[in-house]
Amino acid sequence: MDHRDFLTRFLDASCEAMDAFAADEAARETLIRMGEDVCTSIRNGGKLLIAGNGGSAADAQHIAAEFVSRLMYDRAPLPALALTTDSSALTAIGNDYGYEHVFERQVTGLGQKGDVFLGISTSGRSPNVIRALHAAREKGIITFGFTGVAGNAMTELCDRLLLAPSPQTAIIQQIHITAAHMLCAVVERTLFPVEGR
């Protein structure tokens, strides 16, 4: 089997979506506003909570790691927590209440007013992410969403929403992690400014 044509088409679709994202002024403004919200939260003693499923769960952990460790240069750790990492909590909640509650209960138990919650769902329809967004709003937590489909259930639940311009899950995920790096960079540059960076 010759994979060359498929790989060329995949790369073309990836580049096309990334070009569309790069040209989207509104997306950049959204990321800047998200960064400002995260900075305000952290300055006031808050934190960033992040959740998603599958590849988006890995993205949640990746994002939290960039905040707690570093992205572009050495600086103090920033408070971020992926709600996808505690296997005991995930399996207890999933077993006792149902998988759709695994993030909702963590947001309710760990989140505080003024925190930020980022829900990641390529489809915008993940029940556990939707429930977590509802729980966050009830607690006065600022709600962000990364998704790939306009007009989905996350639209009404997110204070700030970033849409990846592709119908393909893998390419949506590529844009999400790029956006996450941009978000972290905005926060890092704001809270720990370094001349020339």
Swiss-Prot record:
PROSITE patterns: SIS. Residues 38-197 form the SIS domain. Keywords: Carbohydrate metabolism, Cytoplasm, Isomerase, Metal-binding, Zinc. Its cofactor is Zn(2+). Its EC number is 5.3.1.28. Substrate binds at residues 53-55, 66, 95-96, 121-123, 126, 173. Pathway: Carbohydrate biosynthesis; D-glycero-D-manno-heptose 7-phosphate biosynthesis; D-glycero-alpha-D-manno-heptose 7-phosphate and D-glycero-beta-D-manno-heptose 7-phosphate from sedoheptulose 7-phosphate: step 1/1. One of its GO terms (molecular function) is zinc ion binding. One of its GO terms (cellular component) is cytoplasm. Zn(2+) binds at residues 62, 66, 173, 181. InterPro entries: GmhA/DiaA, Phosphoheptose_Isoase, SIS_dom, SIS_dom_sf, SIS_GmhA/DiaA_subfam. The reaction produces a racemic mixture of D-glycero-alpha-D-manno-heptose 7-phosphate and D-glycero-beta-D-manno-heptose 7-phosphate. Belongs to the SIS family. GmhA subfamily. This is Phosphoheptose isomerase. It comes from Granulibacter bethesdensis (strain ATCC BAA-1260 / CGDNIH1).
